[in-house]
Amino acid sequence: MSKRDWLDFEHLVDDEVRDAIKPPSMYKVILVNDDYTPMEFVIDVLQKFFSYDVERATQLMLTVHYEGKAICGVFTAEVAETKVAMVNQYARENEHPLLCTLEKA
């Protein structure tokens, strides 16, 4: 048995099990525009919670501003729920009405 064969575990997975395994459901995390949250705060949120650089964060902030909402990313359910909760909590702590939601992708 070669090293490559030894590392190939594909043969250990039953066909029925392989067919039953499905990728996790994915969810879009969305920022919703409001008339009160400063643009700089939205950029801060996008950098802090979604790891965007300032240029991309600014582009997304403008999408939120002009189109009413923007997708910040697509994640598994647990990650999406955590990001939504963290953004909403951060907004409240800073006394901004910014709303972050999720929807199935």
Curated annotation (Swiss-Prot):
InterPro entries assigned to the protein according to its UniProt record, in alphabetical order: ClpS, ClpS_core, Ribosomal_bL12_C/ClpS-like
Domain of life: Bacteria
Pfam families associated with the record: ClpS
Any one biological process term the GO annotation gives: protein catabolic process
Gene3D superfamilies xref list: 3.30.1390.10
Family (UniProt): Belongs to the ClpS family.
Subunit: Binds to the N-terminal domain of the chaperone ClpA.
Matches recorded under NCBIfam families: PRK00033.1-3, PRK00033.1-5
HAMAP family linked to this entry: ClpS (MF_00302)
Described function: Involved in the modulation of the specificity of the ClpAP-mediated ATP-dependent protein degradation.
Protein name: ATP-dependent Clp protease adapter protein ClpS
